[in-house]
Amino acid sequence: MDRLPRSALASNIEVTAATVQRGDVIQLGGRAYRVQDLFQLPQGAKQLLFESGELLTIHTRTRLAAVRMMRRR
């Protein structure tokens, strides 16, 4: 993962298909994956494309631990 900008704050959150955003860093199997892009699928599911090139499809009820960078004002 890249160094974090000094003007950003990291916030631990739980994400779902409805709340996941580009740039979120999701913890899977003890590894961190940054969301590069996401695609809406039928019935509220989403497919996440990570910077590593890997894909993950999440259902509407899937809940994942993540870190979201918040910019300071």
Question: How would you label these PLM feature ranges?
Answer:
Residues 2-10, 55-73:
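Intrinsically disordered, low-complexity, charged/polar segments
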Residues 32-60:
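Basic/aromatic-rich interaction segments and small domains that mediate binding to polyanionic partners
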Residues 19-20:
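Short, well-ordered loop/turn sites that connect or cap secondary structure elements
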